[in-house]
């Protein structure tokens, strides 16, 4: 892997001054920053390659199509899908989950059941609530304990022949816990259920192998993987994607259209109606190239060192409350905490005055906050460009906030 200084040099935003302080960006769980290698791919596309893709006979259209489909292959190889046609470009993880939920909402009936976990992001709860409302199916919830660890014993009891879909996150966006999705998938398949995994928080830190996991659907967002916003991908097993009805109608997703009926395009285009985010897809491919240039194993190892260092430092602060699994081998580089007697929003405001960007609130995971009976947490989430020195400054900032607000 490059040196930390070389990596940081790839990210121009890290040279920003915020409130007269050098930017310390610890909000990577919300979105990661973008390296010049990805920015340059975006500039190159709009400068020299901009055209609508597919069906165009002119050179520019064919070049743009080739770049877009090459990016799809990069996503396929990164996640080890069998075919590039099993990779759908979407607007992001939320869009991907809604696509699957809409499809199964049309296939399910009263008496069927969907299982999610108590740890989910709202994007993996609300689409299934809507699907259940439309179909008459029921929503069941895997409980968690005080560490945010899912109760697999109760999960097994929830599973039955009525279970049609299990939809769970790979990594908690609020706590950083890595869930045992291998076991969750295997148990669901025993009863004939399909499994969707929300991989938004896992993909930047781990390298999920969809074939090894035997997962049915896996959803990710590019903007959490050093790529642009507004684009992501959904992996789906070919045989399951063929069973699902189209999510949206329009151009590109059809074979033939007449007023009596229409027939639909082959995968993946059946689910890609309209002009896609062409530049976003190409830039997503560039972001994957960037991550591989650093090494996925190396990224994970370095971020884990940051996590361990930060947790050890935080534990020295009197009055701090830490959330999440205490076994840091089962965590990504996400830390949720509170200071006793201090609202998380106030802590975040003080840190911002010091140039430190963190996320405060419920992190689109209100059921977790309800479990802990708190309004929210302060969340610091690290990426490969963060440093131990930044963590030291962060710790001093927390101490300053505590002195000012307690």
Regions found by a protein language model. Give the residues of each.
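Pyridoxal 5′-phosphate
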Residues: 1-406
């Amino acid at each position: 892997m490059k040196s930390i200084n070389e990596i940081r040099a790839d990210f121009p935003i890290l040279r920003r001054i915020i409130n007269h302080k050098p930017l310390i960006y610890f909000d990577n769980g919300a979105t990661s920053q973008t390296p010049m290698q990805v920015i340059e791919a975006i500039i190159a596309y709009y400068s020299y390659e901009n055209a609508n893709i597919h069906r165009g006979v002119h050179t520019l259209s064919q070049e743009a199509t080739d770049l877009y489909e090459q990016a799809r292959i990069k996503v396929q190889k990164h996640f080890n899908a069998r075919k590039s046609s099993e990779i759908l470009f979407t607007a992001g993880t939320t869009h991907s989950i809604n696509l699957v939920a809409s499809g199964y909402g049309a296939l399910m009936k009263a008496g069927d059941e969907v299982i999610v976990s108590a740890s989910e992001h709202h994007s993996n709860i609300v689409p299934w609530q809507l699907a259940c409302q439309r179909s008459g199916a029921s929503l069941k919830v895997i409980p968690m304990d005080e560490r945010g660890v899912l109760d697999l014993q109760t999960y097994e009891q929830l599973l039955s022949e009525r279970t049609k879909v299990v939809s769970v996150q790979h990594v908690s966006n609020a706590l950083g816990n890595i869930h045992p999705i291998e076991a969750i998938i295997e148990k669901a398949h025993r009863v004939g259920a399909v499994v969707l995994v929300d991989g938004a928080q896992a993909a930047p830190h781990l390298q999920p192998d969809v074939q090894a996991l035997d997962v049915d659907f896996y959803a990710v967002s590019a903007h959490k993987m050093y790529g642009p916003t507004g684009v992501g991908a959904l992996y789906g097993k070919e045989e399951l994607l063929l069973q699902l009805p189209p999510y949206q109608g329009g151009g590109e997703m059809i074979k033939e259209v007449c007023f009596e009926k229409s027939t639909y395009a082959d995968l993946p285009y059946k689910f890609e109606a309209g002009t896609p985010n062409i530049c976003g897809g190409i830039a997503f491919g560039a972001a994957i190239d960037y991550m591989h240039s650093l090494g996925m194993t190396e990224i994970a190892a370095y971020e884990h060192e940051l996590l361990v260092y930060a947790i050890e430092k935080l534990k020295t602060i009197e009055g701090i409350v830490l959330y999440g699994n205490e076994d840091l081998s089962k965590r990504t580089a996400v830390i949720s905490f509170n200071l006793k007697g201090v609202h998380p929003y106030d802590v975040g405001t003080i840190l911002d005055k010091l140039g430190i960007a963190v996320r405060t609130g419920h992190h689109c995971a209100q059921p977790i906050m309800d479990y802990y009976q708190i309004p929210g947490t302060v969340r610091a989430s690290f990426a490969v460009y963060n440093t131990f020195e930044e963590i030291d400054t962060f710790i001093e900032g927390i101490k300053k906030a505590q002195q000012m607000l307690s």
